[in-house]
């Protein structure tokens, strides 16, 4: 009887290549996210610690531009991403990060440096824990997506309303719900990004998806940080 030809190393080699590709993809996502956070932090710190510049922005009607520009940028980015090159998408994300830095500069005028650092550290720990869980869990998190997105929309609408009514009680409720929603979104997005890699690996769009994944995780982290700062921050 003839024995079939066997290639015992083929399956293992293919699995290793897939694992290496996934790691490279996720590292690309987190690298872009990290660069975006650095840009945001530098811009926010520079404006927040330059009184004349901060007064020119937040002491005039320009503050409304600073508040709403990031939201407008996200919508623009989402609708234009398919027509952008990978390099163009990456530069647009970095530009958005700078715009977000202008918007976040106001925290340096309201909260102490120590409480800002504490909220950032807490957000980083929570974000990393949920990202790791989302990456490693075998549980399907996609079923939670609709609830998390509805929660996100609710937070967005309530936050816009509270800009004009200025209710501290409403702000606290938004922040508490926001912490839950954005930690959940972090795990959900990481698993989604991982799944999308397997669907589009080898295609040119995969590189662009690194940028979109970075934007999603960046927004989760920044919003989680803001919610924690609102809850725990010590005011000047």
Q: What are these model-predicted stretches?
A:
Residues 1-236:
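A hydrophobic alpha-helical transmembrane-helix feature that marks the membrane cores
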């Amino acid at each position: 009887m003839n024995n079939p030809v066997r290639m015992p190393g083929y399956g293992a080699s293919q699995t290793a290549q897939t694992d290496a590709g996934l790691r490279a993809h996720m590292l690309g996502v987190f690298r872009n996210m990290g660069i975006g956070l650095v840009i945001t932090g530098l811009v926010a710190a520079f404006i927040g610690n330059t009184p004349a510049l901060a007064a020119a922005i937040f002491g005039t009607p320009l503050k409304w531009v600073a508040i709403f520009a990031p939201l407008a940028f996200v919508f623009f980015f989402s609708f234009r991403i398919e027509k952008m090159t990978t390099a163009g998408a990456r530069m647009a994300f970095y530009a958005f990060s700078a715009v977000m830095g202008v918007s976040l500069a106001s925290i340096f005028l309201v909260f102490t440096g120590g409480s800002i650092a504490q909220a950032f550290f807490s957000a980083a720990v929570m974000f990393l824990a949920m990202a790791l869980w989302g990456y490693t869990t075998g549980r399907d998190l996609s079923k939670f997506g609709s609830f998390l997105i509805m929660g996100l929309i609710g937070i967005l609408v309530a936050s816009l309303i509270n800009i004009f009514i200025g209710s501290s009680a409403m702000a606290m409720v938004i922040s508490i719900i926001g912490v839950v929603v954005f930690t959940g979104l972090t795990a959900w997005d990481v698993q989604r990004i991982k799944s999308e890699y397997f669907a589009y690996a080898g295609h040119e769009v995969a590189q662009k998806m690194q940028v979109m994944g970075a934007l999603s995780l960046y927004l989760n982290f920044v919003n989680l940080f803001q919610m924690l700062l609102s809850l725990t921050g010590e005011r000047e």
